[in-house]
C-alpha cells in the first residue's frame, strides 16, 4: 500500500476507497490553492477537506509549489478555513495530521505535536 497519497481530491468519489483510507489512515495531502490554480476545483467551497475530516480520514493541508500557485502553507490554511468554515478543532486536526503523516522521524513528530498541543492549550 501507499505511504501517503498526494492530493487525493477524487478519493471521495469511491465509498470503498473511503473505507480503505479510513481503516489504513493513509495520509492525504490536500493543496487547496494549487487545486484552484490548476482548475481541479473551480471553487474552494467544493474542496473535499471538510468531508474527509468528517469521514475520519487522515487529511492535511499543504502548499504545492507556492511560488507558482500563489500561497505558502499559511495562505492555504487561511483559504480553506474561510471557504469551508472550518472549526478550530478541525484546523488543529489538520495541523496534527500534517506531522503524523509526514516522513519525519518519530522523535521529531512528537516534538512538533507537543508544540501544537501547547499552543492549543494556551489559546483554545
Regions found by a protein language model. Give the residues of each.
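Anion (oxyanion) recognition and catalysis
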Residues: 22, 53-54
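A post-motif C-terminal structural segment
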Residues: 31, 50-53
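Short beta-alpha connecting loops at secondary-structure transitions
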Residues: 32-38, 60-62, 78-83
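Short acidic/histidine-rich active-site segments
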Residues: 57-72
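Short acidic alpha-helix initiation/capping motifs at coil-to-helix transition points
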Residues: 69-75, 89-91
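Charged helix-capping and loop-helix junction motifs
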Residues: 42-50
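Active-site core of metal-dependent hydrolases
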Residues: 1-40
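Mid-to-C-terminal alpha-helical segments outside catalytic/metal-binding sites
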Residues: 85-124
